[in-house]
């Protein structure tokens, strides 16, 4: 993943310098460096290449999928912005399979959530919670210990943190510059709510859903700014109330201008 980590670090440094209007000479150097990164490539068989050359995979089912870093936690790949690369990631995950150690399963939960497949993410989450200790033999493997520690088989905190992050990704995403509500809701999560989840850009989100459909959300600005919201797939329109004003949106993406501490109540239909 290190190549994509460096690529994103340089890209974000350029963005920060431009926002702050500083370090012009350094930005020019970084821009030249950014062009040196090889592009992400799709193999002849359709999966995302792990290496620069299209080598034949020695272990098709290996638990490591670090070449998908651009999908998660990165934001270089998404179904909307780069559909071909996203599909190549999907094929990679299907080839590698769902099995693996705790951290590997946790990461795959996040990958599938980023691809918008809540059912696959939920399936992996349930496998992450599979008892690690065999009641009959006392032996243990991957899964979760009775104290809810993730098992590699030795204790591995990656699975706990990563699994929790995966649930968050199923319910709310903001890595593409907009607030995406219920981007990967599993079919079995028919009703529920969350409160106070934070998104990039400085907002807090509350949301309720019933019968698999979002009913109401509250966007609270923690800083003044413009917040772009993408409606859940189940919604056809949204009524937004800010202060004493109400506005209706029928397009799937809309923007809200909010002051610090201001709330926008969004009702979905």
Language-model regions, residue ranges each:
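Non-catalytic C-terminal accessory modules of carbohydrate-active enzymes
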Residues: 119-250, 254-269
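Single conserved hydrophobic/aromatic residue that forms the stacking wall/gate
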Residues: 1-6, 10
